[in-house]
A protein has these predicted regions:
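Non-catalytic terminal/interface segments that mediate subunit docking, oligomerization
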Residues: 2-123, 261-330
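Structured core elements
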Residues: 17, 60, 67-72, 105-108, ...
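Charged/polar, solvent-exposed surface patches and flexible loops
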Residues: 20-23, 27, 31, 130, ...
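Mobile "lid/hinge" segments at catalytic clefts and subdomain interfaces of large enzymes
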Residues: 82-84, 90-105, 115, 134-257
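Active-site rim segments in enzyme catalytic domains, especially the processed small/beta chain
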Residues: 124-147, 322-330
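Short, charge-rich amphipathic segments
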Residues: 126-130, 255, 263
Length: 330
């Protein structure tokens, strides 16, 4: 049987069945610090900090709360079925009166403008916007750490309580410090599950038995009540997507007026500008010849980094923003 699953909290290869996510989270939170553990003492696992958000709402932020929920461009947004599934789920949630948790920052970064076209054609854009999944651009965003800042009140609460807060994204990498420097647990999920967890606002939920929220009439709503069926998705796909959407968009993909307007000088090789502070000729290539000299014996060298397994370039030098209080920020 094929079961829905996620991956995390620190490596993309660490698969977790959706049905086991709640118990997995409880174990992960208090497990020793490692690939899946966060080292929180059991006595502190229920710790929470009161937050007064920028909109005036008051809530308690705690371990396991999802502060970033992002449908990202890299992995799933070339798959219309899951993208439309996320849109239909959003529509069904809005019809029930459900909202995204006030501490969760949702975003939508389609991998193609075609996604925007078929969302508009299917009438799903408004529902996604209603939940806060606004289109923030076409390209690499949250997965590489370009999610933008959290609300200052949330940022301060995380710092004060040393909270292990989470992100749920539809990206392909979730290494520590990559998505956001304050978010210690990051899980990869399908676009519909990103929407679902944004509404739930926490990993401390079993969707099979726990309500995802309360509707406008005060009745509990289960995820199954709003989850789109395959028939719903296929019906919307048949009505909203045409081959012309792809051919029209991709026929001009190599031409962009703003890019074409940048002045340039034709040349066989890139004309490095010595005064540039942004793009510079690496010193490694100075004096290089077609036939390099053989590597000589290395004596008296020191090891710069001696690392264990599963240490990536993202651990050494995260691609996203770095905190003002860190060494790089100073």
């Amino acid at each position: 049987d094929v079961e829905p699953a996620m991956a995390g909290p620190k490596r993309p290869q660490d698969r977790v069945d959706l049905s086991a996510m709640k118990s997995h989270w409880h174990e992960s939170l208090t497990a020793p610090i490692g690939h899946s553990g966060h080292g929180v003492e059991v006595a502190n696992s229920g710790h929470q900090i009161e937050v007064i958000g920028s909109d005036g709402r008051t809530y308690n932020l705690k371990h396991g709360d999802i502060v970033i929920s992002a449908i990202t461009s890299c992995t799933n947004t070339s798959n219309p079925s899951v993208m439309l599934g996320a849109g239909i789920l959003a529509r069904n949630a809005v019809e029930k009166g459900l909202k995204v948790a006030p501490w969760s920052k949702p975003s939508l970064a389609p991998g193609s403008r075609v996604v925007t076209e078929y969302y508009d054609a299917a009438g799903l854009t408004e529902s996604l916007n209603e939940l806060g999944f606004h289109n923030v651009g076409y390209g690499c965003t949250t997965c590489i750490g370009n999610s933008g800042p959290l609300e200052p009140e949330i940022d301060a609460a995380i710092e004060e309580g040393n909270l292990v807060v989470c992100s749920v994204i539809s990206g392909n990498r979730n290494f520590e410090g990559r998505v956001h420097q304050k978010v210690k647990a990051n899980y990869l999920a399908s676009p519909p599950l990103v929407v679902a967890y944004a509404i739930a606002g926490t990993l401390d939920i079993d969707f099979d038995v726990d309500p995802i929220g309360v509707d406008s009439e005060g009745q509990s709503v289960m995820l199954a009540d709003i989850w789109p069926t395959d028939a719903e998705i296929h019906e919307v796909m048949a009505k909203a997507i045409t081959p012309e959407m792809f051919t029209d968009r991709y026929s001009t993909v190599m031409s962009e007026p703003q890019w074409d307007a940048i002045p340039s000088t034709p040349s066989a090789l890139y004309p490095w500008a010595s005064e540039s502070t942004y793009v510079r000729l690496p010193s490694f290539f100075e004096g290089i010849q077609p036939d390099p000299t053989p590597i000589s014996t290395i004596d008296g060298a020191h090891v710069l980094l001696k690392l264990g397994d599963c240490v990536t370039t993202d651990h050494i030098s995260p691609a996203g923003a770095f905190p003002h209080s860190g060494p790089a920020g100073q």
